[in-house]
Amino acid sequence: MFKVAVCALLVLASTAINVQSSIWTSKDQKAFAQIHQSGWGKFILNFAELHLTTGGILSELNSEIEKLIGEMEEELAGVHHEFNRRTDVHNREVARLEQEIQDKERELFNAHDFYDNVLIPQGERFAAQLEQLQENIAHNRQTLEQATVQRANDHETFESEVVEHNDAISAIDECLQLLSTIAAPSLAEVKKVQKNLAKIQNSLKKHNQFQIFVKVLLEITVDSNFADQGALRDIIVAFNNLRVELVDSLNQITADEAEQVADYNAQVIALNQEHAEFQRAVVVKNAEIEANTTKQEQTLDLIDELDEDLATLNGQLQAENDDYAFATDVYNATVAEYNKEINAANQALDLLNQPRFQDYVKSQLKGA
């Protein structure tokens, strides 16, 4: 249609209606001015003048012009239809993109929330728990070391006390043996008994509970008359009593040592079991920390990916809006141009059907 119009306009370029003719009213001249702003309107008037001046029939001209106007209206309807289709596509695309953007924003928010409020606190908690486990392990080993040192010290004390008790018992046995073989001991034998008592006293100087027995025996041996059989029996009884006390004491410290050894062994087992549990807990905690670290890295990668996806979607939405805005501008300009041409064509059609137009054509023919 437009190609034909361009060719026709070129052909009719030299043809122009004399709008200054006295035939035309001021209203006609105003209409001419509006029509000449339109290519189609100007074309119709010039074509009509040419058609009539060459003997054409007005009704045929009207039919052709109406057909031309109808074609323009059909083309305008096509423009409306295509733009409506473009609008539907635009609305669907915008709705889709906005929904995807909303979904991505929700995913991005959830990823940030998961990272900030779950993974970070969880990682800090795991690190604190691992530190506590390491402190527990250090305390466990320190306790075991202290218990081992204390056990060694206690055992050394026990062995020393056993030696002391055995030395004292041996000295008592020697005194008893000596006292049992004499009827009237000499001064040398008494001195020997007293020497053994001094030895006993020295052996048992750390054991206050025996000091009174030793002290009494020393006093007896100093003051007693060993020739007196009654006094001698009292001395022997005292020695025997001391020996019994020493044997009981030795048995007790031996039993205490056995109990302490058992307690120590049980403590060692318990501490080692606890240490093994701590070590297993450390392995588990390290695995949890590694998993948390991996999850943090994956979540940060996801956040970066979601940011990129969101930027892409926003770019697509902006591009679609820009493209639709351009299409709308083209549509509005096209519709305005079609409306201008159709209105001008209708005005031209109305004007050429005025009797004055035919009079003008006749006047032009006479003038020719």
From Swiss-Prot:
<dbReference type="GO" id="GO:0055039">
    <property type="term" value="C:trichocyst"/>
</dbReference>
<keyword id="KW-0175">Coiled coil</keyword>
<feature type="coiled-coil region">
    <location>
        <begin position="257"/>
        <end position="354"/>
    </location>
</feature>
<protein>
    <recommendedName>
        <fullName>Trichocyst matrix protein T1-F</fullName>
    </recommendedName>
</protein>
<feature type="propeptide">
    <location>
        <begin position="17"/>
        <end position="55"/>
    </location>
</feature>
<comment type="similarity">
    <text>Belongs to the TMP family.</text>
</comment>
<comment type="function">
    <text>Structural protein that crystallize inside the trichocyst matrix.</text>
</comment>
<feature type="coiled-coil region">
    <location>
        <begin position="56"/>
        <end position="153"/>
    </location>
</feature>
<feature type="signal peptide">
    <location>
        <begin position="1"/>
        <end position="16"/>
    </location>
</feature>
<feature type="propeptide">
    <location>
        <begin position="190"/>
        <end position="225"/>
    </location>
</feature>
<keyword id="KW-0732">Signal</keyword>
